[in-house]
Amino acid sequence: MNKKDLKPASVFYYFEEICQVPRPSKREEKIIAYLKAFGRKHGLETKTDEVGNVLIKKPATPGKENLKTVILQSHIDMVCEKNSDVEHDFLIDPIDTVVDGEWLKAKGTTLGADNGIGVATELAILAATDIEHGPLECLFTVDEETGLTGAFALKPGFMTGDILINLDSEDEGELFIGCAGGANTTAEFTYQPCLLYTSPSPRDTERS
């Protein structure tokens, strides 16, 4: 199997495209530019907010105009790690993907499928002409990996949808309806040196 055999073909086409675009957390300017150009190319309303979140709207297909607006959401940054023997600059170098058996992998670096596969899914839906749907809003948020900056910065009115589906999940065919969330805790402790007590050995006891 090679990359052209991966299904859904349109999703993996766009995943390969965004693998050519550097997108480290807090340095997403190139992928933001890519998304804006994508929106213009397909004649879709596209806007960004002050932190870089991108929203691309797609009108409903004929007969579906009265359905509720659905928001599809994914984050555009990725975890950037590489093997110690690999030379790779995540600010300028593309991700080199390869099919290994049934897996799509990256050569010596993280792949960026979290959440690149979600981004690619949204792009495939936006570009599709054979999918019936109601009004769609595709939301691409920044800096999820190091602080959820994009999500926390969203303001009322940026989206208008009634339903939001987050595509940052790891289980195909399963839908999560809730989660416990996460939290960061910063703790400070003051330490003072102390002498550790050690019990005497049997030999020391005999000597005494």
Stretch-by-stretch model annotation:
Residues 197-204:
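Conserved small/polar residues in nucleotide/adenosyl-binding loops
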Residues 156-175:
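A glycine-rich helix N-cap at a beta->alpha junction
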Residues 140-142, 167-169, 189-191:
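Short, structured patches in soluble enzyme cores that scaffold and shape functional sites
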Residues 21, 25, 105-114, 174-176:
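Flexible, glycine/proline-enriched loop segments at strand-loop-helix junctions
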Residues 2-103:
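Acidic/His- and Gly-rich active-site-bordering loop/insert found
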Residues 64-140, 144-145, 151-162:
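Active-site metal-coordination/substrate-binding segment of hydrolases
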Residues 176-185, 189, 194:
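TRNA-recognition modules of translation machinery and tRNA-sensing kinases, especially anticodon-binding
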